[in-house]
C-alpha cells in the first residue's frame, strides 16, 4: 500500500496531510469491515408502556369478580427483542407485563406491523408472551371464560396492549445494530415451590426420578451485546407464578417478575453511569457525525469542556472531569436504553409463596392432599417470604430473580452462533392424536377431546382459593353443581368418558353462546 501511495504522490503531488487522511480512512474502513464480519446478528431492543386503565376494571388472573383496580403499584411494560441475520431471517419476541398474551391482541398488532413493514413481521416470526402477573387489567382476551369476571371486553385494556406492543417492536426495529448474543444457565432455589406437592406425588416414581426437584428451578438468560454500545439488554426465562400480590390486591402491578425487570434495568443504568463517570479515552463512534476531526480538535474540546459551569455555579477546574461529562452526555444522547425482561416459562404449579400454605384462622398448615382448612378451601393461603406484607414478598421474590440474573449476565460467555429460524403452527387440541406407552409394553394411540373444567378447578389454588365448597383433587363432583352446570351445557357421554376420572363442572370446549368459551385451536410459536 505504501509503495502505491508513494507512486501516486510522485505523479500527482498529493499533500502529505491529505495522504495520511486517506490512509486513516482506508484503515477505518478495513476495521469496520472486520467488526461487521465478526457480528453474527443484528439485534434490537424495545420497551413501551402498556399499563392501561388503572381504576374500575377487573383484574386478570384470579377470576375474582371483586378484584377491581383502584390505583398503580408500578407501571406495566412490553419489552421486545429482534434478532436478524443481515441478509436472512429475523425473529421478534415480546414479553408482556400481563397475565398472558391474547390471540386477538396479536392479530391486531400484526395488522399494524404489516401496514408499516409489509411482510417483514408476520405470525410466523413474531412471538408474544406474558409474565402471568395476576395484577393487570383484564378484558382483552377473546374467549368468554377469560372475560366473565371483567363482564366482557374492555376496550381500554385492549388498546393499551396493542399500542404498547406495536411501539415496543418499532423501537426494537429502529435500534437494530450489529451485535452478539450470549447464553447462560443456572439454578435459582428460593424463588418458587410446588403448590400442589401431593398431586405431583401421583406421578410415577420413574417419571419423578428424572428430575432433581419437583419444580423447574433453572433460569436461562440471553445477553445482548451491541458492537458499538456494549450490553443493551437481557431476557431470561424462569418458572414462578406472578402471585406474590394476592387476590385481594387492587393495585396494578407487574408482580415479582415486573419488579425484577425494573431492578435490573435500574442496576444497569446506575452501573453504566458510574462507568461513564470513571471515563475512558475512547470517544463514541457517533460523535464523528458531530465533529469533523475529533483528534485534531481534541484540545479545543477539552477547553470547551473546562468552560462549562459546575452545579454550584463555580468554574469547573478539572478539565479531564468536565471532558468526561461531555463525552458521557454525547454517548447517552444516542445510546439505546437497556432492556431487561423476566419472562415466564413452565410455571404450572410453581408458587412464589415459598413459606408454604397455612390456614388463616388457625395458623396451622393446610391439609396436604386437598389444601383445605376444616374442609374449606377459602381459608388456605400460601405465604410469601415477606408475609404478611405482599408488597415485601413481591420485592423479595423479584430481587432473588434479579440477583440470579445479574450473576448469569456477568458470567455469560457462551456465544450463540448459527442461522436464525422459527417455527409456527396451529394445533387443534380438541382432536389431537397422541401415542402413549401401555402398561406391560407396547403403545396405543389415544385422542384428545374439547376442553372442560373440573370441579377441582373451582377450588382454586393456595395462591388464590376458590369459593363455595369445592376441593382440590375432587374426582367425584357434586349433584347440586351438576344441576347448575346442566343449565348452561350438559356434556354428552363421549365427553364425560374422555375426561374421566375428572368430573366436568363446565363443558367450556363445547359451549358456543354467545361465542366460544374456550380455545380449541392454539397457535404455537
Task: Say what each PLM segment does.
Residues 20, 31-525:
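Non-catalytic substrate/cofactor recognition surfaces at enzyme active-site rims
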Residues 1-25:
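Classical eukaryotic N-terminal signal peptides for Sec-dependent ER targeting/secretion
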Amino acid at each position: 500500500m505504501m509503495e502505491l501511495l508513494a507512486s501516486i504522490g510522485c505523479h500527482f503531488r498529493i499533500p502529505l496531510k491529505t495522504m495520511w487522511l486517506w490512509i486513516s480512512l482506508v484503515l477505518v474502513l478495513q476495521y469496520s469491515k472486520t467488526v461487521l464480519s465478526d457480528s453474527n446478528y443484528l439485534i434490537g431492543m424495545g420497551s413501551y408502556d402498556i399499563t392501561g386503565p388503572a381504576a374500575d376494571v377487573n383484574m386478570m388472573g384470579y377470576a375474582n369478580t371483586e378484584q377491581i383496580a383502584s390505583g398503580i403499584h408500578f407501571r406495566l411494560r412490553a419489552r421486545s427483542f429482534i434478532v436478524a441475520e443481515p441478509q436472512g431471517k429475523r425473529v421478534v419476541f415480546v414479553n408482556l407485563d400481563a397475565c398472558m398474551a391474547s390471540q386477538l391482541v396479536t392479530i391486531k398488532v400484526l395488522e399494524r406491523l404489516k401496514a408499516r413493514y409489509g411482510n417483514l413481521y408476520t405470525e410466523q416470526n413474531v412471538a408474544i408472551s406474558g409474565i402471568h402477573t395476576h395484577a393487570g387489567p383484564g378484558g382483552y382476551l377473546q374467549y368468554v371464560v377469560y372475560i366473565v369476571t371483567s363482564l366482557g371486553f374492555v376496550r381500554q385494556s385492549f388498546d393499551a396492549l396493542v399500542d404498547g406492543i406495536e411501539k415496543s417492536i418499532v423501537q426494537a426495529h429502529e435500534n437494530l445494530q450489529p451485535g452478539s448474543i450470549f447464553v447462560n444457565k443456572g439454578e435459582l432455589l428460593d424463588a418458587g415451590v410446588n403448590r400442589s406437592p401431593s398431586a405431583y406425588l401421583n406421578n410415577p416414581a420413574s417419571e419423578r426420578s428424572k428430575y432433581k426437584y419437583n419444580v423447574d428451578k433453572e433460569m436461562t438468560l440471553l445477553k445482548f451485546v451491541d458492537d458499538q454500545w456494549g450490553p443493551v439488554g437481557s431476557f431470561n426465562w424462569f418458572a414462578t407464578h406472578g402471585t406474590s400480590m394476592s387476590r385481594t390486591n387492587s393495585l396494578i402491578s407487574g408482580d415479582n417478575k415486573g419488579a425484577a425487570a425494573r431492578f435490573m434495568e435500574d442496576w444497569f443504568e446506575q452501573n453504566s453511569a458510574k462507568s461513564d463517570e470513571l471515563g475512558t479515552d475512547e470517544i463514541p463512534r457517533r460523535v464523528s457525525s458531530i465533529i469533523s476531526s475529533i483528534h485534531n480538535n481534541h484540545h479545543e474540546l477539552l477547553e470547551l469542556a473546562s468552560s462549562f459551569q459546575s452545579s454550584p455555579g463555580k468554574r469547573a477546574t478539572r478539565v479531564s472531569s468536565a471532558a468526561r461529562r461531555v463525552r458521557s452526555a454525547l454517548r447517552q444522547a444516542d445510546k439505546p436504553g437497556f432492556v431487561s425482561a423476566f419472562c415466564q416459562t413452565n410455571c404450572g404449579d410453581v408458587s412464589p409463596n415459598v413459606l408454604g400454605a397455612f390456614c388463616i384462622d388457625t395458623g396451622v398448615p393446610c391439609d396436604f392432599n386437598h389444601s383445605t382448612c376444616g374442609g374449606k378451601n377459602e381459608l388456605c393461603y400460601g405465604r410469601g417470604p415477606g408475609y404478611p406484607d405482599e408488597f415485601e414478598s413481591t420485592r423479595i421474590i423479584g430481587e432473588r430473580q434479579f440477583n440470579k440474573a445479574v450473576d448469569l449476565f456477568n458470567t455469560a460467555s457462551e456465544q450463540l452462533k448459527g442461522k436464525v429460524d422459527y417455527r409456527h403452527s396451529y394445533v387443534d387440541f380438541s382432536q389431537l392424536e397422541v401415542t402413549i406407552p401401555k402398561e406391560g409394553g407396547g403403545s396405543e394411540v389415544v385422542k384428545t377431546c374439547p376442553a372442560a373444567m373440573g370441579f377441582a378447578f373451582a377450588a382454586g389454588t393456595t395462591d388464590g382459593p376458590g369459593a363455595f365448597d369445592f376441593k382440590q383433587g375432587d374426582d367425584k363432583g357434586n349433584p347440586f353443581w351438576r344441576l347448575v352446570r346442566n343449565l348452561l351445557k350438559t356434556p354428552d357421554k363421549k365427553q364425560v368418558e374422555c375426561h374421566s376420572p375428572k368430573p366436568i363442572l363446565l363443558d367450556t370446549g363445547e359451549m358456543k353462546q354467545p361465542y366460544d368459551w374456550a380455545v380449541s385451536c392454539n397457535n404455537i410459536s
